[in-house]
């Protein structure tokens, strides 16, 4: 744990000028290392412990990370239950592209009366939120029938991030990619 804290502190841009120091002899009896941050004078104490052995006789604790299920939302906090049809376009040079999501009879129409208006298009996963305000509704006989949302990717980095979201979303919802 101490090594992790030290690595985080050293890797932080705030503590780029960290200086190792020894504690006074009268402190807790053993040498320790202190990293000082230039941010508000806050210091982080990292006590040295016995080096970890490579072979442990007892089971160690395992860290379990829970990942958020990928979701699409039109109203923040309310997941869209309808699975969309997604079309992708990409420029020849690969620098930009557009994803067009079509939701036929989306569940947001059922809940928008209680929860409020559609505020945008939000794709949420464990990396964060991708969002767009390019959302339009199609009406049939005066009633909302479908929603079309566009997400524009202007850089290869945005394209890669979108593809990571779509991979997670498709795995969670049983979708597959069909190239046409």
From Swiss-Prot:
One record GO biological process: photosynthesis
Location(s) in or outside the cell: Plastid, Chloroplast thylakoid membrane
Disordered, as annotated region: 16-39
Organelle transit peptide: 1-64
Keyword Isomerase found: no
Keywords assigned by UniProt, alphabetized: Chloroplast, Membrane, Photosynthesis, Photosystem II, Plastid, Thylakoid, Transit peptide
One cellular component (GO) term of this entry: photosystem II oxygen evolving complex
Subunit structure: Part of the photosystem II complex.
Annotated protein name in UniProt: Photosystem II reaction center PSB28 protein, chloroplastic
UniProt organism field: Oryza sativa subsp. japonica
Upper taxonomic lineage: Eukaryota, Viridiplantae, Streptophyta, Embryophyta, Tracheophyta
